[in-house]
Design a protein with these regions (language model features):
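N-terminus-centered regions that define maturation/targeting leaders and the start
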Residues: 2-165
C-alpha cells in the first residue's frame, strides 16, 4: 500500500517525558496544575476525543490495589491537538466537558500518592462521534458511552513519588 501514510495516534507532554517523573508543579505538593499535553496521528473520521488519567497503583484499605481516577475529559473537539499546562474548565477548547474524578469533583487533581512511586496513565481516545451530554460521568460511565466508537487510543505514562510524607 505505498503512497498511504499510516497514522498512529500519539500522546506527548512538554511537562514530562514518557515514563519519567511528573514535576511537582502538577501535583498536590505544588500548584496542582494539569500538565501540557499534545497529540498527533489522528485517524480519519475522528469527531471528538476523550481523556482519562488514572493511577493503577493506588492502595485501598478494602483491596490490595485499586485504580484511582485523577481526570476525566470528553467531547474535546476533533480540531484540538493539545491542552496547555494549567488548563481549567474555563480554558478548555469550546465544547469540551469534564467528568467526575475519584474525589467526586471535576477538573484535574494531580498525583498525591500516600506511599511509594506511582504510575499515572494518560489515556487518549479518538472517537467517531461527539458524545451526548452526560451527567458529569465518572470513568466507568464514560467508558460505557465510548464503547463501539473508539477509532484509536494511545497512552502516556508518568510517575510520581511524594517528596514530603
Amino acid at each position: 500500500m505505498s503512497g498511504f501514510a499510516v497514522l498512529t495516534l500519539v500522546l506527548t507532554s512538554t511537562s514530562f517525558t514518557a515514563g519519567g517523573a511528573i514535576p511537582s508543579a502538577h501535583t498536590c505538593e505544588g500548584a496542582d496544575r494539569a500538565p501540557a499535553l499534545a497529540w498527533s496521528g489522528v485517524p480519519a473520521g475522528t469527531k471528538s476525543f476523550a481523556l482519562i488519567v488514572d493511577d493503577p497503583d493506588a492502595p485501598d484499605p478494602k483491596a490490595p490495589q485499586t485504580t484511582w481516577v485523577h481526570w476525566v475529559l470528553y467531547d474535546l473537539p476533533a480540531t484540538a491537538s493539545a491542552l496547555p499546562a494549567g488548563v481549567t474548565v474555563a480554558t478548555l477548547p469550546a465544547g469540551a466537558r469534564e467528568g467526575r474524578n475519584d474525589w467526586g469533583t471535576t477538573g484535574w487533581r494531580g498525583p498525591c500518592p500516600p506511599i511509594g512511586r506511582h504510575r499515572y496513565v494518560f489515556k487518549l481516545y479518538a472517537l467517531d462521534l461527539s458524545l451526548p451530554l452526560l451527567a458529569t460521568p465518572d470513568k466507568a460511565h464514560l467508558e460505557q458511552a465510548m464503547q463501539g466508537h473508539v477509532l484509536a487510543q494511545t497512552q502516556l505514562i508518568g510517575t510520581y513519588e511524594k517528596k514530603h510524607k
